[in-house]
């Protein structure tokens, strides 16, 4: 069983640290090396590898500094994105072994064209593809690509823990509560999130089961969501419902 802890970075990023019982660890999307090195020193951990989901600087900015401290680091990342320092390129369907656990690589284009996610041990590290109550902006991909990527993630077991890369839950809730005003699960989740954030507690990880109840981008087949975007969508297909929802959120 692997343990996961968050390392906050910048304003709202989470760098995820995965470690085993023998004080060896992996970090996911280290945009900044400084907080990572601090945790490694404080907890006497040895860094073995880095997992990268996509090429944006707030996810890769710490690679070079971490490699200076750990020259033999294996840096795993998407094959189709220009990321300096990658030593193991991966794509959809590949596997990465971490401390005896096999993690599957999932291609999830949308936020960026080469974006990947890693799933194993009941945990999904999905970068900026799926957030709690939200999804990533389409900087490079199309609505159809992101829609299919989210469907791929939604097909994972409901108990899968969702480790996204940003603390966006409160702002995402503000939009979701407009998009689906009568969803009782959203009302309850808002109360939970407000309490957690007031206490300085992270809302991540979420679970896939929870997201299917509250995340409008995973609920595009629901009549309540279709009704909300009816004046913004070109038709009532699930894909166009998603596209209209994403356009709405971009300008919310």
UniProtKB/Swiss-Prot annotation:
The keyword rRNA-binding does not apply. Coiled coil: none annotated. This is Hydroxyacylglutathione hydrolase. Thiolesterase that catalyzes the hydrolysis of S-D-lactoyl-glutathione to form glutathione and D-lactic acid. Pathway: Secondary metabolite metabolism; methylglyoxal degradation; (R)-lactate from methylglyoxal: step 2/2. The keyword Zinc applies. Binds 2 Zn(2+) ions per subunit. Signal peptide: none annotated. InterPro entries: Clx_II_MBL (IPR035680), Glyoxalase_II_hydrolase (IPR050110), HAGH_C (IPR032282), Hydroxyacylglutathione_Hdrlase (IPR017782), Metallo-B-lactamas (IPR001279), RibonucZ/Hydroxyglut_hydro (IPR036866). Disulfide bonds: none annotated. Monomer. Its cofactor is Zn(2+). Zn(2+) 1 binds at residues 54, 56, 111, 128. It catalyses: an S-(2-hydroxyacyl)glutathione + H2O = a 2-hydroxy carboxylate + glutathione + H(+). Its EC number is 3.1.2.6.
């Amino acid at each position: 069983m692997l343990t996961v802890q968050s390392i906050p970075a910048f304003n709202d990023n989470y760098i995820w640290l995965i470690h085993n019982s023998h004080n060896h660890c992996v970090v996911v999307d280290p945009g900044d090396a400084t907080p990572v090195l601090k945790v490694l020193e404080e907890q006497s951990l040895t860094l073995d590898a880095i997992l990268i989901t996509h090429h944006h600087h707030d996810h890769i900015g710490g690679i070079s500094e971490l490699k200076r401290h750990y020259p033999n680091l294996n840096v795993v990342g998407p094959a189709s994105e220009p990321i300096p320092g990658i030593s193991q390129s991966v794509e959809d369907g590949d596997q990465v072994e971490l401390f005896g656990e096999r993690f599957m690589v999932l291609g999830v284009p949308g936020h960026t064209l080469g974006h990947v996610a890693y799933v194993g041990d009941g945990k999904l590290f999905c970068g900026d593809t799926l957030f709690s109550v939200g999804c990533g902006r389409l900087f490079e991909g199309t609505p159809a690509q992101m829609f299919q990527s989210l469907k791929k993630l939604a097909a994972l077991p409901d108990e899968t823990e969702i480790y996204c890369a940003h603390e966006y839950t409160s702002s995402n809730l503000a939009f979701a509560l407009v998009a689906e005003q009568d969803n009782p699960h959203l009302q309850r989740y808002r109360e939970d999130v407000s309490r957690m954030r007031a206490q300085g507690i992270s809302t991540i990880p979420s679970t896939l089961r929870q997201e299917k109840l509250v995340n409008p981008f995973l609920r595009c087949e629901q009549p309540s969501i279709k009704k909300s975007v009816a004046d913004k969508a070109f038709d009532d297909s699930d894909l166009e419902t998603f596209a209209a929802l994403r356009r709405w959120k971009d300008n919310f």
